[in-house]
């Protein structure tokens, strides 16, 4: 006979452990336990039955796997936390004795990050454990980038120290430099929350959110201690990723950083990239102002030129001794033309012909020179323009260092990005000097010849469509086209604002819209006729008043009686039509086109009714399970169709208002 199992020794009671028990087992404080769980990727678990795990468990009790807590017992960071706890006790005892000097000495020896910048511990081994391969780290980079870009834009407080913000900003700028060098950026989208970016790195799509450069207001209901724990982990992760990405393209990491330029607002221009590919590949050279900072050594260059000249002289002598090249038969001259694959026999396979790629999306802005006005978002525009090949970007000196030029009148500028309304400076014709201060200059409307002026959305739409959009649609003060998300794939039958309304509306919608337009036109015509009748009646009344002194009371009573009789007759016709099911016969004959549209609408309704009846009969042949599934699918499709119908109706109304 087997032994009886004791209660709480197996099953769910042994597989789960409460948070209080875990903290006691690890001999940690609750904040340190939270840090350790965040860094190691251990999350609370919900058991199937709380009563079986613990009878004293309440709704707020947090459970963990016992194996996860057992795994934390071997973590090297535990000893670091315990040493820190012992040190804090020593400092508190020294302060209790009144020995301030001893407490200060202990604090200096602790090498705290907020005092000396030296970390008490590192998370390198945690990164290696959680991400065995580099692809695993790239897949978890979305939240990392979003969090670090958020903290890079926060103001410094007691909960968010300035050193943490500076470290986040530097890591983010290093990552942006890699995207610029490797042309890995693919799409971007302007939203209410911020700017979304999508990059493709080693086959992995990475999507992150960057907030706008506004003054952030830090509220008190956000726990920045927990967020700071995530940021500390993500900073280590992005440092590893940046090192791997830089070395993969032959760049030195970390890149050279100019603190003086960064203090002057250079941001991307404060970094100078160095590496193997910088000297040979023009696409990956260090760009701060559009050109490399370090040139070749003049002595070495002179020796190289001398050797090249000697080789040229020797090759010319050999060519003169051998004779002219025209005497050689069958010599083929080199050509840049692409070979054509032609079928040898008639009826052979037709092979696809090779062709030069006329447009490279990664070099979309490579031939253009931009100037950014002061009201435009300089940081995001500079990054996205450089990521797509632009090397010459200028802006006003008040926006910071690192520009290609600060002269707005530079003739090499091809595009200027503006985001201000067109100012109409109205001059006073009478010559009064009241508004002379506001209208004495036309600087905001000044335009340089040979330059295109566009709004910032032109850059994002061109990047998402992989082609330069027409600048006429994005001119200053123009009503911009809809800015659609490039991350949403259009589905068949769904509303698409880029397609004309006539191509995506149903037949019934088109007929209803035409009938509505016809009714509106008929109503306008009747209003005009009524106005004309009223005007003619008023003229006749005026003439009668001129001829006669007044109108008799009997004539007024006769007119009112006629109106009452006509109204009663009209009501009688409506009641008879309602009883018989026929339409009310109007005074005017119906237009032939309107009548044809009404007939088409009735035929369409009959067709829909017959299709619905056929569908109901087909549903009766299904099983109960399949019928429920089919009805659920119908409900979802009808809901989407109703939403699309509302959008099309709204668009139709807006188009009518524009035409009016």
UniProtKB/Swiss-Prot annotation:
InterPro entries: BRCT_dom, BRCT_dom_sf, PES
Stretch list, region Disordered: 313-358, 471-660
Function: Component of the NOP7 complex, which is required for maturation of the 25S and 5.8S ribosomal RNAs and formation of the 60S ribosome.
Gene encoding the protein: NOP7
Principal location: nucleus
Superkingdom in the source lineage: Eukaryota
Subunit comment: Component of the NOP7 complex, composed of ERB1, NOP7 and YTM1. The complex is held together by ERB1, which interacts with NOP7 via its N-terminal domain and with YTM1 via a high-affinity interaction between the seven-bladed beta-propeller domains of the 2 proteins. The NOP7 complex associates with the 66S pre-ribosome.
Taxonomic classification: Eukaryota, Fungi, Dikarya, Ascomycota, Pezizomycotina
One function term, GO molecular function aspect: ribonucleoprotein complex binding
Record field: compositional bias (Acidic residues): 504-566
Any one annotated GO CC term: preribosome, large subunit precursor
GO biological process entries: maturation of 5.8S rRNA from tricistronic rRNA transcript (SSU-rRNA, 5.8S rRNA, LSU-rRNA); maturation of LSU-rRNA from tricistronic rRNA transcript (SSU-rRNA, 5.8S rRNA, LSU-rRNA)
Gene3D superfamilies: BRCT domain
Residue runs in coiled coils: 501-659
Source species: Chaetomium globosum (strain ATCC 6205 / CBS 148.51 / DSM 1962 / NBRC 6347 / NRRL 1970) (Soil fungus)
Keywords attached to this entry: Coiled coil, Nucleus, Ribosome biogenesis, rRNA processing
A matching Pfam family: Pescadillo_N
Name of the protein described by the UniProt record: Pescadillo homolog
Protein family membership: Belongs to the pescadillo family.
Span of domain BRCT: 360-476
Biased composition (Basic and acidic residues): 331-342, 584-619
Subcellular location: Nucleus, Nucleolus; Nucleus, Nucleoplasm
